[in-house]
Each structure stands twice: as structure tokens, then as C-alpha cells.
Amino acid sequence: MIQVENLSFSYQNNKVFKNLSFSIKKGEYLCIIGKNGSGKSTLAKLLAGLIFKQEGSIKISGYDTKNQKDLLEIRKLVGIIFQNPENQIINTTVFDEVVFGLENLATPRENIKEIAENSLKSVALLEYKDRLTYQLSGGEKQRLAIASVLAMGTEILIFDEAISMLDPVGKKEVLKLMKELNSQGKTIIHITHNRNDILEASEVMVLSNGEIKYQGNPYKIFEDDEFNPFLIKIKNILEKNNIKIDDKNINMEDLVRLVYENIS
């Protein structure tokens, strides 16, 4: 469904990606994880067709993001939910929020009510359809943003740090919904910096400095020392101080003190 080949992208003369290649199958639940600045959000926008001045190719169900005509189809197929739902919804009723997007797509008027209600039902918000959007909780606002995306006929949903600002209840609600949508055949791409978010995914991609360090089983992230953030910090401290762990002349007390002073 998604094929990325030799993707390179620069922002303000800084190389974000260089020759990135990967594929995402239809109906997959992929979690993309990485530190701030690793290129996760840029990749999300590229996949959604919001940025398209790149080298290499991105094809979504055969549509090419570099083709202006194809971009219109891609933006119907791919929906993106951002970190702050306040930036995606307007101050109106829950029902009218979904209707607004459908009207912009020139959806036949006789179909709008049914599509909007079905979308709200799919995210358990139909009973709130007459409520004003500002009265919703954070989790409910994200579910409304998802409903608006689903109403467009979206097959691929990208969640760009979409649960990072929610309270525990809201996070649980949205994660459950993501899993349900995936079980219905939707392709889910969940972008996060929190390793605990990846366990529901069928596959995980680790991004670091614009490169794919790993793509595969999410449980490897917890098992492999290469992805242990504590061990990575220690390794960076040693490298910064030109210390090799197999050096027989290392004073262990000095080493422990050095790590303790720099590990925060």
C-alpha cells in the first residue's frame, strides 16, 4: 500500500532524510519511534502529501506524491491526526464539525447526514453530536478528529504524537480505538517517542538522525541493548570522554562517578 524508495529531504539546508526506503502493507499497524528531531513528524507529513518537495518517491496505493493529480487522491486515502486536537477542530457542534469536512469535499448533500453519523458512531461520539466541541475532553476531541478523518473515506490513519498530550483515560480511549480501526482493515501509523506505546503494533520502525535503525517486531525494542535508552546514555558518556569499556586501566570508582554525574 505504501512504498517509499530512496527518500531524501532537506529543511533549511539540513538533511532530514537520505535514501530512506521502506514499505508498509495494507492493514498493518506500524509504530514509528524515535527521539525529538529524528524526522518522525516530517515523515508523517510527507506520507500524508502535506510536504511533497522531496527526492526519491513515495507511492500510496500506486499514487505518486509528486503528481499533483495523484495528491488529491492521496489526501482522500491518508488522514493525519496531530498532537493537539485544538488545532484540528473548530468551535461548533460535534456533528457540524464532521459535516464541515464533508461539505468541503463536495459530498452529495443527501449522503452527508448518514456519513457523519456513521463516523461519529464508529468513535463512540454519536450521542454527543449536539454537544459543542469545546465541551469535550481531550480524548473526546481526538476521537472527533478521527471521526472527521474517517468520514472522508480514509484508509490510512497517521497518528502524529496524537496521544502524548492526553491524560491516562484519554490515552487508553484513543489507543483502543486505533486497535479497533486496525482490526477493521485500516492501516495505522502511530508516531511516538514513548516506547510503551508500541506494544499493540504489528511492526515498529526506529528512526534516528533520519535513518531507519530497525524495522520489525516491536518486542525487540525491549529485549535488545541497542535500543535501551539507559545503556545508550552510558555509551554516549563513555564516547564523549574517550573511554573504552575494555580498557584495563579504568578506575571503576572514577567511571561510576563520571556516569552518575552525567546520567541525568
Swiss-Prot record:
Keyword terms: ATP-binding, Cell inner membrane, Cell membrane, Membrane, Nucleotide-binding, Translocase, Transport
Predominant localisation class: membrane
EC number(s) per UniProt?
7.-.-.-
Specify the domain of life of the species encoding this protein.
Bacteria
- In this record, what's one Pfam family? ABC_tran
BP GO terms, sorted: transmembrane transport
Task: Indicate yes or no for the key word Cytoplasm.
Answer: no
Q: Provide the ABC transporter domain boundaries.
A: 2-234
Q: Which GO terms describe its cellular component?
A: plasma membrane
One MF annotation (Gene Ontology) recorded for this entry: ATP binding
Would I find rRNA processing among this entry's keywords?
no
Residues annotated as binding ATP are G34, K35, N36, G37, S38, G39, K40, S41
* Membrane topology of the entry: Peripheral membrane protein
Q: Which SUPFAM superfamilies match?
A: P-loop containing nucleoside triphosphate hydrolases (SSF52540)
Describe the task this protein carries out. ATP-binding (A) component of a common energy-coupling factor (ECF) ABC-transporter complex. Unlike classic ABC transporters this ECF transporter provides the energy necessary to transport a number of different substrates.
| Record's subunit section | Forms a stable energy-coupling factor (ECF) transporter complex composed of 2 membrane-embedded substrate-binding proteins (S component), 2 ATP-binding proteins (A component) and 2 transmembrane proteins (T component).
Report the PANTHER family cross-referenced here: ENERGY-COUPLING FACTOR TRANSPORTER ATP-BINDING PROTEIN ECFA1, HEAVY METAL TRANSPORTER
- Give the similarity note: Belongs to the ABC transporter superfamily. Energy-coupling factor EcfA family.
**Protein name in UniProt:** Energy-coupling factor transporter ATP-binding protein EcfA1
